Amino acid sequence: MDIRKAYLDFFASKGHEITPSSPLVPDDATLLFTNAGMVPFKSIFTGEIPRPNPPRKTSCQTCIRAGGKHNDLDNVGYTARHHTFFEMLGNFSFGDYFKEQAIAYAWEFVTEVLKLPKDRLYVTVHENDDEAFNLWQKHIQKERIYKFGDKDNFWQMGDTGPCGPCSEIFYDQGQEHFNSSEDYMGGDGDRFLEIWNLVFMQYERSADGVLSPLPKPSIDTGMGLERVTAIKEGKFSNFDSSLFMPIINEISKLCNKTYVYESGASFRVIADHIRSSVFLLAQGVSFDKEGRGYVLRRILRRALRHGYLLGFKQAFMYKLVDIVCDLMGGHYTYLNEKKDFIKEQIRLEEERFLSTIENGIEIFNEELKNTKEIFSGEVAFKLYDTYGFPLDLTADMLREKNLKVDEEKFELFMNEQKARAKASWKGSGDKTASGDFKNLLEKFGENHFVGYEKAECESKILALLDEDFKEVSTLKDAGWVMLENTPFYATSGGQSADSGFIAKREVLDTQKFFNLNLSFIKAGEELKVNDIVHARIDTEKREQIARHHSATHLLHHALREILGSHVSQAGSLVESNKLRFDFTHHKALNKEELESIEKRVNKMIINSSEAILENMPLEEAKKSGAIALFNEKYQGNVRVLTLGESKELCGGTHVKNTAQIGSFYIVKESGVSAGVRRIEAVVSKAALEFVKNQLEELSKVKDELKNNDILSGIKKLKNEILSLKNELKNSSKTELDSKNIQGVEICVKRIDNGDIKAMIDDFKNKFAKAVILLIQVKDEKITLAAGVKDVPLKAGALVKEAAQILGGNGGGRDDFATAGGKDLSKINEALKQSLETIEKAL
C-alpha cells in the first residue's frame, strides 16, 4: 500500500490542497532544518501572513532532526523509531474546520483507509479538553480515551504565541510481544505506539502566561510515515519495514554479513544516515566545516564509523545511493536527476574521512586504556581537529563503553581556535523580529509590485517605519516606506534591489519582509502617511542588473550542457556591474571547460532569442521542463522565463532579447565549499570596462618589457633569467679554500655571491669526508649554512652555535642546516669559533 499517496489523496478528497514538500532548509533563521510538517505554515499560524485560499492544506513533508534543539542523531540505530530523516504526513486547517472534523477525518483515515483494527486503537486528550473527549466518544469507546496533562497533551510553538491542547491516536502492538512494567497507556514502554498527533490551536499565550481564545482556531496534525508503515506491515521496528529493509539488505550484501536485529545497530545507522545524506545533498546542502554542511558531515562520518565496525575499509556509502533513489525517486523525482552528483559527493567525502579514520581510532583506543569514567577533552579535540572526528561521533563511541567525554575541556580547546568551526547555530538576531509587519499585513495586506511594467508611478504611502521597523506617521530621518504600488524590485532570488527616488528622497535599498515590499530612504524632506508621491527607479541600473540576471540563466544552461545535468544552482548574486553564480560540481573547471562555457553563453546571446514570460501552476511548470530551485518557496502560480534553450522559474527582471546582454566574460572561477564551485562574470558595460582594464594592463606590461610584442618580450626575459641562473650556478662552483685535518676536508669562510646550498653540496660531493660552514651577507642580512659528510659532527649544532654568536638562531638535519644572524660585527668571531669546534671534534 502506498500510504503517502493514500493520505494525500484522502485529504484532497476532503477539500485540502496538496502542498509539495518544502525545502529541508527552511525560510526561518531560528531553525537549522525543517523538522516538522507545520514549519512551512508557521507564518500563517502566527498570523504574520494572511490565511491562504483554500484555508486547508495537506502535505508529506521531508524533515531532518539532527542538530539544534531537535536532535535525534545520538539515538538513531539504537531505538526502533528514531531517525535523522523522516517524512511527516499532515493536514492543516487555518481558521476553517476545527476539532469535530479533524477527529472525524483522522478516525476515517485510520480505520477505513489504513484499515487498522479498532480494538487496537486508543486515544489521549488533554485533561481539561472535555470537548475533544466528548467528540471522540462518537467514534471510540469511552474506556479507550485517556486524559493527560500539559506534559503529554498540550502543544505550544514557543513561550508565547499560538498554542492549544492536542489529542493523540495510539496503536496497541499486542501484550504478547512486550513485558516491560512501562507497557501501559501513558507509560514509557513500546507496546502502545503513538501514530498521529492532532493539535488544536485555540489559544494565544501572552508574555505573562495568560491564555486567550483565538478568534479563528486552527488544526495542525502530524503522522510519521515510517511509523505508520511499520504498523501497517506488522513490524515492531521502523527499520524492519519496506522503507528500510531494501537498504539494509544492500548493506548486508556489500559487507557480506547477515543482518540480525539484536546486533544490527550499525546497519540501522547506515540505512538511516544514507537517506539523510541523499536528501540534503539533493537539496543543495554541501559538506562543510560549519552550519548545515557540518551537520551533513557529522551524519555521514557517523555512518562511516559504523561501516568501519562492519568491516568496510573502502568507500561504500555512495554505492547505497541507487537503492535510496529507487525507493524514493518515484515521489521525489529530483533524486534521480541528482543521483550521479550525490554519489560523487559522498564518495569524495568518504575518501576524505577514511584516510584518517584508522589513525583516529588507534588514538581513541590508546586514550581509552587511561580512561576510567571521563574521556580526555584534549584528545577528543585532537580527534576532531586532526582526524575529522565530530565530537558526537567520539561521544557515540564512548557511549558503547558506558563512558563520557570531557565536553568542557573540548569546548575550551574549540574556543582557542574559533576560526576553525562554530560551536553552535545562531539565528539572525536582527531588528525585524520586533517589527510592526503583522499590523501592516492586517491593515493593508501585501502591497503591489508594478516594476515589471513600469519604471515610475504615482503611489500612495500606506505606511512609514523608522530604522527599528516601528510605525510612524511622519518621517524626516532615514527609514522605510511602504507604497501601495511600488516599481522598486526588492532583493530576492539573488537579484539586488532597485534604487531611485520616492518624491525627493533617495531610495538606497528595497527589501521584502513577510511579503511586504519596503524601500529604505535617506533622510530628507518630511513624508507623511497617505501622501501621494512620485516613485521612480534608476532605469540604467535596472537595465544593467537585468542583463546580468539574464546572463546567469544562460550560464546555468551552459554549465548543465557542458558539465552535466548534476549541476544545479547553489546560490547567486546579481548586481549592476557583475554576477556571481554558485553551482554544484565536484572539481575545479579547467581552461578548456571555462572557454567552452564562455563561448556557449556568447553564442546564446548572439542568437537574439526573445524572452518569453509565462505564469502557470508549479506542477505544470515542472512538467514543461522549467528548472526550479530548492531554496525558493513557490506559492500558487509561478513565473517561468524562457531565454532560448534556457527555461527557469524566476521572479526577477530580465532583458527582452538575449542580444541586449551584449557580451559575456568569465572573470574568475573558484571553490566555495566541498562540491560547490563559483563563477564570477561580467556583461554589457561591465564587460567593456573589464576588457578596457585588461588592455590597460597589457599596455603596462608592454611598457615594462619595452617591447610591443608581449610574447617576444616574455621569451627574451625568460632567456635572460635562464642566463642569470646559469651564471649564479657557475659562481657557486667557485673553488673554496679548504684544509685537511686527519683525512677530513674542512672549509669555514665568508662568501659574497653564489648559491650557498649548491656550494655546500658541490664541496661535499668532492670529498669522502667533509665539514663546511659558510656565512653570506646580502642586503645587511646574514645567512649561515653548514654541511657534514661522514664525520661525527652535526651540522645543526654547528650552525646553531655560530648563529647565536651573530644574535640569531637556526638548525636542521645532521648533514645540512641553515640559520640566520643579525650582528655583522661578529662574523669573524663566529667563523673562528666554528673552526675551533670542528677541530676539537676531530
From Swiss-Prot:
Top EC category: ligase
InterPro entries: aa-tRNA-synth_II/BPL/LPL (IPR045864), Ala-tRNA-lgiase_IIc (IPR002318), Ala-tRNA-ligase_IIc_anticod-bd (IPR018162), Ala-tRNA-synth_IIc_core (IPR018165), Ala-tRNA-synth_IIc_N (IPR018164), Ala-tRNA_ligase (IPR050058), Ala_tRNA_ligase_euk/bac (IPR023033), DHHA1_dom (IPR003156)
Record note on cofactor: Binds 1 zinc ion per subunit.
Residues annotated for Zn(2+) binding in this entry: 549, 553, 650, 654
Domain of life of the source: Bacteria
Pfam family, one: tRNA_SAD
GO molecular function, one term: aminoacyl-tRNA deacylase activity
GO cellular component, one term: cytosol
Protein EC: 6.1.1.7
Cofactor section: Zn(2+)
Signal peptide start and end residues: none
Main location: cytoplasm
GO biological process: alanyl-tRNA aminoacylation; negative regulation of DNA-templated transcription
Described purpose of this protein according to its UniProt entry: Catalyzes the attachment of alanine to tRNA(Ala) in a two-step reaction: alanine is first activated by ATP to form Ala-AMP and then transferred to the acceptor end of tRNA(Ala). Also edits incorrectly charged Ser-tRNA(Ala) and Gly-tRNA(Ala) via its editing domain.
Protein family membership: Belongs to the class-II aminoacyl-tRNA synthetase family.
Free-text comment on this protein's domains from its UniProt entry: Consists of three domains; the N-terminal catalytic domain, the editing domain and the C-terminal C-Ala domain. The editing domain removes incorrectly charged amino acids, while the C-Ala domain, along with tRNA(Ala), serves as a bridge to cooperatively bring together the editing and aminoacylation centers thus stimulating deacylation of misacylated tRNAs.
Official protein name in the record: Alanine--tRNA ligase
Source organism: Campylobacter jejuni (strain RM1221)
